[in-house]
UniProtKB/Swiss-Prot annotation:
The gene is RPL30. This is Large ribosomal subunit protein eL30. Keywords: Ribonucleoprotein, Ribosomal protein. Pfam families: Ribosomal_L7Ae. The keyword Cell membrane does not apply. Belongs to the eukaryotic ribosomal protein eL30 family. InterPro entries: Ribosomal_eL30-like, Ribosomal_eL30-like_sf, Ribosomal_eL30_CS, Ribosomal_eL8/eL30/eS12/Gad45. GO terms for biological process: negative regulation of mRNA splicing, via spliceosome; rRNA processing. GO terms for cellular component: cytosolic large ribosomal subunit. The keyword Magnesium does not apply. It comes from Eremothecium gossypii (strain ATCC 10895 / CBS 109.51 / FGSC 9923 / NRRL Y-1056). One of its GO terms (molecular function) is pre-mRNA 5'-splice site binding. NCBIfam families: PRK01018.1.
Length: 105
């Protein structure tokens, strides 16, 4: 029961970031924001391909950005951010009113 409750909590925090903060969706924009040093946190879906995931981890390590591995796949991550399409990676640029940066990392 605890993992489901934790997942709901993360989804709520993510929804608050979408509402009040700044974020980007997708691989290309994530790499761009990591290279510019603007990213605070990246959230990677569970079914992201291994090569793409390792490249994101590498850029996150270079820019000293926190990485969170979302428990669900890209369909669930897309639903969590309120989109009707699949999302493999979400980059949090500014958390807004959410405390996602302190709780996830």
């Amino acid at each position: 029961m605890a993992p489901a409750k934790n997942q709901e909590n993360i989804n709520q925090k993510l929804a608050l970031v979408i509402k009040s903060g700044k974020y980007t969706l997708g691989y290309k924009s994530t790499i761009k924001s990591l290279r510019q040093g603007k990213a605070k946190l990246i959230i990677i879906a569970a079914n992201t391909p291994v090569l793409r995931k390792s490249e994101l981890e590498y850029y996150a390590m270079l820019s000293k950005t926190k990485v969170y591995y979302f428990q669900g796949g890209n369909n669930e991550l897309g639903t969590a951010v309120g989109k009707l399409f699949r999302v493999g990676v979400v980059t949090v640029l500014d958390a807004g009113d959410s405390d996602i940066l302190t709780t996830l990392a």
